Design a protein with these regions (language model features):
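N-terminal glycine-rich, Lys/His-bearing helix-loop that initiates the first secondary-structure elements
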Residues: 1-12
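Conserved PLP-enzyme active-site core in the AAT-like
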Residues: 8-9, 30, 48, 58-256
Length: 256
């Protein structure tokens, strides 16, 4: 039933695995077999408590993270230069944003990350903030002192959320900036399709501490995700995980 020109261009393999949900291939919303195992392998690769496949890209993952951590009427500290998905997550959760300014590079005319001192000052001024979200690395590839920020945030016993869209590779090489999970961020998401080998829109969410309820993350993802996720796309995410876990250091050394 596939268009002939499209079939000639793509070949038959993508369509052989483009199936709907049934027992043999598992289901993303209540994974019990191969998807469950794939997510566990991702968690093992990154050294975290729990990993989730995010089929709506990092935009959907960011919305899920915010909705999992803060409730309606609660305050969340975010940079001014956030992606629109952060604004969407705040709207959907009913949370109240408290904004902090990133560092501005006057020479390049771009925004960098936030300084640890900025985070500390804002938390001192707003004692009722329930979570902090930062971008690291930034959309321009600039990393901040995420370890110091994590320490400051955790001194208030609140979760640190990290938009690590451009950093799914950081964990796999010691010469790269510190990754969110290695800094102790409580939850982060990554665009596996941007930097690693997954197909477009495939991302990962990592839960890294008890400050975030992994069961709630699963529930929120079930609210946001399609009930017909693409198996070719999910397979590409699993294979990207395998590649970076097995060959990541070698590939990154060559690149660096």
């Amino acid at each position: 039933g596939v268009d002939e020109e499209f079939l000639e261009f793509m070949g038959t393999n993508p369509f052989k695995i483009d199936v709907t949900i049934f027992k043999m291939v598992d289901g993303l919303h209540h994974p019990k077999s191969c998807i469950k195992e794939a997510q566990e392998l991702a968690a093992d690769a990154y050294g975290v408590k729990k990993s989730f496949f995010a089929v709506n890209g990092t935009s959907g993952a960011i919305q899920a993270m915010i909705m999992s951590v803060v409730k309606s009427g609660e305050k969340i500290l975010v940079p001014r230069n956030v992606h629109k998905s952060v604004s969407a997550g705040i709207i959907l959760s009913g949370a109240i944003p408290v904004y902090m300014n990133p560092e501005i590079d006057e020479e390049l005319g771009i925004a960098h990350g936030v300084r640890p001192s900025t985070v500390e000052k804002m938390l001192e001024q707003h004692s009722d903030i329930k979570a902090v979200l930062i971008i690291n690395p930034t959309y321009y590839g600039v990393a901040t002192d995420i370890q110091k920020i994590a320490n400051i945030v955790h001194s208030y016993d609140i979760p640190l959320i990290v938009d690590e869209a451009h950093g799914p590779h950081l964990h796999f090489h010691e010469d790269l900036p510190l990754s969110a999970v290695d800094a102790g961020a409580d939850i982060c998401c990554q665009s596996t399709h941007k930097i690693l080998g997954a197909m477009t829109q495939m991302s990962l969410i990592h839960v890294n501490s008890n400050r975030v309820d992994a069961n709630r993350v699963q529930q929120i993802l079930s609210l946001l995700h399609t009930t017909s996720p693409s198996y070719p796309l999910m397979a590409s995410l699993d294979c990207a995980r395998r590649q970076i876990a097995i060959h990541g250091r070698e590939l990154l050394t060559r690149t660096i």
